[in-house]
A protein has these predicted regions:
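Acidic, Ser/Thr/Gly/Pro-rich intrinsically disordered interaction regions
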Residues: 2-102, 126-137, 151-332
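Loop-centered beta-sheet repeat module
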Residues: 143-145
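A short mid-domain helix/strand-loop element embedded in enzyme catalytic domains
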Residues: 101-130, 148, 152
Length: 332
């Protein structure tokens, strides 16, 4: 069963009491992110109905579920998503969190497409260079949009929750990540962010850490979407898709090992894409670490459980660190 990006249903509290894994007494207005549970050896799945909830015999083919451990080695745990759905899944932020969850699945699918493109090119079935070029645009664009989704989450949380330090006056935060970290196109220092928006130093430091990578991501996307710049030349080699080792912004990421660069100066685009996805996810994880020391959150919705992501394309996400560390090509 596919349970990704399902619409939010209203279910009576009394009906939710039949799900033994939920801490109904401490919901505090939060929504339930999934009714899929894996408890050691057995799946438990509830479906909203007009009468409340109905237990059914099902398991997720693609989607997210609660468990004490992954049911499959390929099921992914992300601290950011687990924290948000367990402790901050209010209706005002749920759709943004769900959009980030969906983007993670989409990035896995997008990365896996390159294997299809590579095999199709080797078999001379299609001209795949432009396939790769447009997919690179998609990955950069999706990662860029995830920062704005994250900022929507931050702004909504900021308006609705209590700070540990209640002497700090709260202001409304912009819903654009760019406005939080850039001024006149330049990265703002942590102290300037703190002064501009009246946020705690810990949160301003988080924005400062994320700003430089975000600025590169934004500039690449804006050059293509808003300024009419064509994507960098993508080369098709026997080992997969490549760019010149001098190509920016890719060269500035410093992800290529010298022994993986071809004699003609071409380097695999694969570790570049891995780097972009890794840094985007790290920024989300960093936020989860930071915000827990600033905002008072209710306890876990499903105590003792974690959220795991199941997808058809998780393997690409699991391999990200290895691909980046080893400057891997598609024939590796």
């Amino acid at each position: 069963m596919n349970n990704t990006m399902k619409p939010m249903h209203k279910v009576p509290i009394d009906a939710l009491k039949q799900v033994p894994y939920l801490d109904i007494a401490n919901l505090q207005g939060r929504a339930i992110p999934t009714l899929s549970f894996y408890d050691s050896t057995k799946w438990h799945f509830w479906m909203p109905t007009s009468d409340g909830l109905s237990a059914i015999d099902a398991r997720p083919a693609e989607g997210d579920y609660f468990s004490r451990a992954p049911e499959r080695p390929s099921d992914i745990y992300m601290e950011f998503l687990n924290f948000m759905v367990q402790r901050a899944y209010w209706p005002s932020v749920a759709r943004f969190i769900d959009a980030i969850r969906n983007d993670v699945h989409n990035l896995g699918a997008s990365l896996q497409k390159f294997h299809l493109f590579h095999h199709a090119a080797k078999e001379k079935r299609f001209h795949t260079r432009r396939f790769a070029s447009t997919e690179i645009e998609y990955i950069f664009g999706t990662c860029r949009s995830m920062f704005d989704l994250l900022q929507e989450v931050i702004a909504a949380l900021w308006d609705t929750v209590r700070l540990y330090d209640q002497n700090i006056p709260k202001r409304h935060l912009p819903k654009s990540f760019r406005k939080m970290v850039l001024k006149d196109g330049k990265v703002m220092a942590s102290d300037d962010i703190c002064d501009a928006y009246g946020i705690p130093k810990q949160l301003a430091d988080y924005y400062s850490r994320a700003a430089s990578f975000f600025a590169v991501l934004r500039q690449y996307r804006d050059n293509i979407i808003h300024h009419g710049k064509t994507p960098e030349m993508i080369f098709l080699t026997e080992r997969g898709f490549a760019v010149s080792k001098e190509t920016e912004p890719f060269a500035s990421f410093s992800v290529w090992q010298q022994d993986q660069i071809q004699p003609n100066g071409l380097a695999s685009i694969r570790p570049v894409l891995a780097h972009v996805v890794i840094e985007t996810i790290k920024s989300c994880e960093d936020f989860a670490h930071t915000i827990q020391g600033i905002i008072r959150f209710p306890p876990d919705i499903a105590p003792g459980f974690r959220l795991y992501l199941r997808g058809y394309h998780n393997e690409e996400l699991i391999l990200l660190e290895s691909v980046k560390a080893n400057s891997q090509w598609w024939d590796a």
